[in-house]
Amino acid sequence: MKSRSYNQYCGLAYALDVVGERWTLLIVREMIAGPRRFKDLLDGLPGISTNLLAERLKNLEQQAVIRRRVLPPPAGSTVYELTVLGQALEKTLLELGKWGSQFVPQSMEGATVLRAGSYALTLKTFFRPERAQGINETYELHIDGEVLHVQIAAGEIQVQQGAAPKADAVFTTDTPSYLQLLAGQLQPDQAIAEERIQITGEPGALDRFLSICGIADVQAETAS
């Protein structure tokens, strides 16, 4: 399919020529947590067709936003990952995600299941570096079968798909409970008592994680 262009001599217009098509930014989002197989992307983007995903990936590859590579044995899978040019979109996506959070409804009813890319974007968007000073911990999250790990060090955050080589704490929960914890709608003690979250490791790590990455305070600041 021939790519369309706004044909405007403007940086924003040219940016939209590259990433403005439907699904494109969500495909980029899915790679924020690391390389993804075609099937991973298809599973993480309910509603996109196989042909359309292939077309969007081809366009992004042609624009050098992503690249394909084959993982070494024993995996041997072909994965898609962001190039340096693609990684430069992260800051823009974080700001766009923060702006878009004011339109997110309270209930997930009718919405599709979240995947690692969406979790990673949310964690990075609402990360509070001023609260992370002096904390050097790695948290492993298991959310309805999705596994990712969050590393906090030197006031910075890194989020990657998959289990951590060495985690200080492992949190296992479901999507509604996880989102309610982040939003401050569910308190950690209540979640533990009701067995809505299981913690392996230091129990206080959950409070630190929510203080650093929770969205309750940010939502209050936005509302004011």
Question: Which residues does each PLM region occupy?
Answer:
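Short hydrophobic beta-strand motif reused across regulatory alpha/beta modules
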Residues: V65-I66
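Alpha-helical DNA-recognition elements
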Residues: N59
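Residues within the DNA-recognition helix of helix-turn-helix
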Residues: R56
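N-terminal helix-turn-helix DNA-binding core of bacterial DNA-binding proteins
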Residues: C10-S49
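Basic, amphipathic "hinge/linker" alpha-helix immediately C-terminal to the N-terminal HTH DNA-binding motif
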Residues: G20, P72-E95
